[in-house]
Swiss-Prot record:
Family: Belongs to the universal ribosomal protein uL29 family.
Superkingdom: Bacteria
Keyword annotations: Ribonucleoprotein, Ribosomal protein
NCBIfam families: L29 (TIGR00012)
Pfam families, alphabetized: Ribosomal_L29
Protein species of origin: Pelotomaculum thermopropionicum (strain DSM 13744 / JCM 10971 / SI)
A biological process from GO: translation
Recorded name of the encoding gene: rpmC
GO cellular component, one term: cytosolic large ribosomal subunit
Protein name, UniProt field: Large ribosomal subunit protein uL29
Lineage of source species: Bacteria, Bacillati, Bacillota, Clostridia, Eubacteriales
SUPFAM superfamilies listed in its UniProt record: Ribosomal protein L29 (L29p)
One Gene Ontology term of the molecular function aspect: structural constituent of ribosome
HAMAP family assigned: Ribosomal_uL29 (MF_00374)
Family annotation (InterPro entries): Ribosomal_protein_uL29, Ribosomal_uL29, Ribosomal_uL29_sf
Amino acid sequence: MKAKELRELTDAELNKKLSDSKEELFKLRFQLATGQLDNPMKLQEVRRRIARVKTIIRERELGIRRA
């Protein structure tokens, strides 16, 4: 999901997206450790999604508006 799309979500939806992504990352790390992970790039995608969501939440806390 792109940052532009994430900015259209409400705070509650962003927090839900963040918790879902963290849970998904946990599961992917577990699969990596047990050797069952098919697509290692999925880890990077989920980490970046978490970073995007956290960035948008922080922007809202600081009152920063991005185009």
